[in-house]
């Protein structure tokens, strides 16, 4: 959570009505986000400076591992994710039908996603699928559930938005079971602080880096496809 003092209290109160162990990562907020979370009695990880999405996920993974949690649901604090969807992504993990459950915005197309975001997400997801052999619809969804095996065996390293792809690449290499569940994401205005072009480019570069490390044979077959997709991304952005 980064500067979410206006929404964090309501979110935590609603979550505490259904769930016991709640972790909030205060990612260098300059407002009262961290103080509010602490007063409401949840587990708070405090970053002295903003480390970004990847830094927050890394810290949450480590804390969940330390607490020996059986499952971890990652959930945005900006109001885009619906609390009622948590049980949907948690169910396959509880029933041992998957190691990772991803909440997808595209399986039922009920999320009113801004056009530029949809194009960017689908481009990055396409690159991820080509480079890993996965067949998923939303590689960039942050609404996920991980089981204990994932928490114990995967050590994310990316500090940026590329961490979502990194986890998928490492999971595929380990032959972990990945499933997607349809969810609805609420877009009221544009809550993102990321420049879409910078974000897209950074995720693509992260994907190339992790594919070259984890799947070197695949890496040399996708540069042309990546450059082609980047061209499409920039072309659409200028329309």
Predicted regions and their residues:
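A conserved acidic beta->alpha catalytic loop
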Residues: 26-34, 79
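Short, well-formed alpha-helical segments that are part of the catalytic scaffolds
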Residues: 2-17
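Acidic helix N-cap motif at the loop->helix transition within catalytic regions
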Residues: 6-10, 31-40
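Conserved sequence signature across two-component system core domains
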Residues: 1, 25-27, 47
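Short loop->beta transition adjacent to catalytic acidic/histidine clusters or analogous donor-positioning motifs
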Residues: 14-23, 32, 40-42
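Hydrophobic helical membrane-anchoring modules
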Residues: 133, 157-239
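Acceptor/aglycone-binding surface of glycosyltransferases and processive sugar-polymer synthases
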Residues: 43, 47-66, 71, 83-161, ...
